[in-house]
Amino acid sequence: FSDRSVSDISMVTVNSFDDYVSDLDMFIREIVMKREGRRPLYLYGHSMGGAIAALYLEKHPEVFTKAVLSSPMIEMLYGNFSHFAVEAILFVASVLNWNDKYLPSQTPYTDEYDFESSCCLSRARYDYIYKCKVEEERYRTNGATYRWCRAGRKASKYIKKHAQEIKIPVLLCQAGKDYLVSNASGH
């Protein structure tokens, strides 16, 4: 489980995606490498985890042999908002000190079962995640903050600028119906 920098445990917020990369590096070096020894390591990352995996591969090119990135969050989609509009909104939110406020349409966790309006296409997967959240309070992360969005945009720019630093084979998988992550950014 991750520590929360805010009292609302359902709020997804981070100063920098480098925090996630540091956590992953500590896990890999302190647990995985000690347990697995010199065996080849393969990295799998999905969505936001795919962005974290890409950052990790760029910053630690010697650790993994191969990787799979599934719908990696190399670039987020913002509905009808242009990138310029998103930057303007994030700037205003920063000036108003809304960093740890929920983004529009983002909300705290509720235990309401609502597969139909979720971003999930698999009911079995939704049911599994729903059960985990009901049973364990620390799984109840739900809504992103302005701070998280800003950190995500910065991470996306870094990933694209430094993609050539990934030297291992990477299988890139995309979800045709994904409306949260841009498929075009993975090319």
Regions found by a protein language model. Name each.
Residues 12-33:
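Alpha/beta-hydrolase active-site loop
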Residues 48, 52-140:
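Alpha/beta-hydrolase-fold enzymes
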Residues 168, 182-187:
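Short alpha-helix in the alpha/beta-hydrolase fold that links the catalytic acid
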